[in-house]
Regions:
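Extended, low-polarity segments enriched in aliphatic/aromatic residues
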Residues: 2-38, 42, 46-294
């Protein structure tokens, strides 16, 4: 809980703070629960923000999504906001490789800062989900998710699945979208990646595979590219017997291409220093380790 204080990133998130996390699809067993996040969210006095999905489930309309936020306990502890509940706004991506605009919920403009909390794990479409995916697909409205998934072909949710592009274009479109959110909050945005309950499946899956690796730890950074690269390296360097299963998911979907693409866009870097900030490393060997990624 006091990870944010200890992983002092030299930043105090100002004003109205949006905390972007994954509310967890109905039926999913792996998503990070509201109690786990309690200290950090209350410390920044944040509003838990989410956006509607572009596929069927319990989160594709505001009404259903608000009910799920209630059922999963988010609204019991925190202020919550479905950012695309009213309308979309468009952010320009001037140097976008695939898309030149990003459709996000209009409520994004109500916030001065953002704390991005990502549950690091595999993903059936993106290979893995971390900070970059949370910034892109996570913050996009349902039309925006469609636009990214179709690499800019359509914002019509009903036409998403018949317009899927080649995989690398989708991944590059995610990097483009991520850049627009990071740059919007530049200097007032921080990232936490939690390497816990790591399944090959995302928290958006109603039926997800159980975690395949033991928990590794919690990372904090001001750089979304560095923090995702550090997570992938921690998986790759692990001796855990589930490592290959997770890497197969990441590699088969060209997951790491998002790091290369984001690197090219220049809103961060994949070169990092990983600092273990546990005070007593021995005592912590059975618990989550805490790292800062600089």
């Amino acid at each position: 809980g006091d990870v944010y204080k200890r992983q002092s990133l030299g930043i105090e998130l100002k004003g109205n703070v949006a905390v972007k996390l994954h509310s967890g699809e109905e039926g999913n067993q792996n998503y990070l629960k509201p109690e786990f996040m309690h200290d950090i969210i209350t410390r920044v006095s944040g509003t838990v923000v989410e956006c509607n999905t572009a596929y069927n489930g319990a989160r594709n309309t505001t009404e259903k999504h608000e009910e799920l936020m209630n059922n999963h306990g988010w609204s019991k502890y925190y202020k919550t906001d479905i950012m695309d509940s009213e309308r979309d706004i468009i952010l320009d991506i001037q140097n976008g490789m695939i898309i030149k605009k990003n459709y996000v919920g209009s409520h994004l403009n109500n916030y001065d800062s953002m704390l991005v909390i990502s549950h690091f794990k595999g993903h059936p479409m993106g290979g893995f989900g971390g900070a970059l995916k949370q910034l892109s697909i996570g913050v996009a409205s349902s039309s925006g998710k469609t636009y990214i998934h179709t690499a800019g072909k359509t914002t019509d949710v009903s036409k998403l699945w018949e317009n899927l592009p080649e995989q690398d274009k989708f991944i590059e479109a995610m990097a483009d979208a991520a850049s627009s959110i990071h740059n919007k909050f530049k200097g007032n945005i921080a990232y936490i990646n939690v390497m816990k309950n790591m399944s090959v499946d995302c928290d958006c899956c109603a039926k997800a595979e159980d975690p395949c690796m033991k928990d590794i730890g919690v990372l904090a950074s001001l750089d979304p590219i560095a923090i995702d690269k550090a997570c992938i390296d921690l998986v790759r360097n692990s001796t855990d017997e589930g490592r290959d299963h997770l890497l197969e998911r990441i590699e088969s979907r060209h997951g790491e291409h998002i790091i290369e693409s984001a690197d090219k866009l220049g809103f961060g870097t994949s070169i990092y220093e990983l600092i273990n900030i546990d005070k007593n490393k021995e005592a912590n060997k059975f618990a989550l380790h805490h790292f800062t990624v600089m």
